[in-house]
């Protein structure tokens, strides 16, 4: 069951990579709401040759990485200190989007997709 939950949350990572690939126009916003899984499936299903797509510029992706690193840090600090997670953040969405950006930009510790971004963030 835990593996199924983890798989389901990976759609947030997929949404982030869809953003990197410029398959959506809207910005990658504050991680407070979950993505639309049906939309992700439709986008991937209806896009020919994903490997040929041009990604967003490095500076845009690195700017998002830094922003999501800060969101992730805020969530982890709140949990470690027994405080409430900031109300504008969802811990799981934050974790998965940070994971995807870290993996895509080849950050140390994120060399493999299946690596874990667990730093005190709840998995359920």
Where are these regions (language model features)?
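Extended, charge-rich alpha-helical interface modules
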Residues: 1-124
């Amino acid at each position: 069951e835990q593996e199924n939950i983890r798989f389901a949350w990976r759609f947030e990572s997929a949404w982030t990579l869809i953003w990197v690939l410029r398959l959506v126009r809207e910005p990658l916003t504050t991680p407070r709401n979950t993505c639309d899984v049906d939309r992700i499936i439709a986008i991937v299903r209806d896009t020919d040759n994903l490997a040929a797509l041009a990604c967003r510029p490095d500076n845009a992706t690195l700017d998002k990485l830094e922003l999501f690193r800060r969101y992730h840090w805020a969530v982890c600090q709140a949990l470690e200190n027994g405080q409430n997670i900031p109300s504008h953040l969802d811990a799981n969405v934050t974790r998965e989007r940070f994971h995807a950006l870290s993996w895509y930009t080849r950050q140390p510790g994120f060399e493999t997709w299946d690596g874990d971004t667990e730093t005190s963030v709840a998995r359920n």
